Each structure stands twice: as structure tokens, then as C-alpha cells.
Amino acid sequence: GPMGPEEAGISNEIINRYYKSKPILGICLGHQCLGSVFGCVIGQCQNVIHGERSVIKLGDSPLFNGLDNEILAARYHSLYIKEANFNNSELRVIATLKDGTIMGIQHKIFPVFGLQFHPESILTNENGKKILGNFLKIVYGEVT
């Protein structure tokens, strides 16, 4: 959406209520909401990104099982989780742009993930389907 986490309706409340008991995958604004709930600073992009494919560097996460270290993925956003001084006791960074911009986060204990890019977009192709499939495996206990 065109708003920030503070205007995202009940999203933050849902995250707070369920993150310890239910797997969560936040995409785009959902990713920013997760960051906000866990104390990250949300910033305004210098340039609004609308329908661009970018190289995403993937880190170690069950969400990325079976994928290469880099994928092309769709981005549509004007806000992002600021990487400057990212030192979070509950979250870790699992995906970035080449310049270090945060594109993915994961809770250190619970199966809670945020992606700034869009795995569901046709621009992300088969890699996006694999990410969503990996999340379903996590939900159904086939992967930890």
C-alpha cells in the first residue's frame, strides 16, 4: 500500500498478537510492519520503486532453500527498513540489494519472515513460487 506501518490498520496488532504462535510472512508493507513492530526504523526511498526487477542477494534462511545466492525479484515500494545501525535483538537480515538495502528479515526464534520484494509477482518468476512453497513447508512443519 501507499502508506506506512503506522497506517496499516490492524497489521501491527496482528503481528504482536500472533508472532509467537503462528508463522508469518509479511510482503512489502507487511515486511515494513514487521520491522516496525520489532523496533526497526522505516525510511522513505529516494526514488519510488514501481515494477522494477532487482538483483536480491539471499542469505541463509529456510525461506530460500533450493535457490541460488542471487535472484531477480520484483519491487514496488516507497518505504524501506533502514539498514544504518541495524542491530536488532529479535530480527536478522536474510536478503539485501547489492548496496546493502534490506530486502528480507527473519525472526531469530519464531517462523516470522518479511520480504520487501514481491515473490508473488510474475516479474519474480519461478524463484518466487519456490519462496512461497518454502514458506508453506515451514507452516506445515516440513522444514525448520
Where are these regions (language model features)?
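Flexible gly/pro-rich beta->alpha loop and the following alpha-helix that scaffold active-site loops
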Residues: 1-26, 38, 133, 137-140
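Pocket-forming structural segment of enzyme catalytic cores
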Residues: 17-19, 24-25, 32-113, 117, ...
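Short, charged, low-complexity patches
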Residues: 128-132
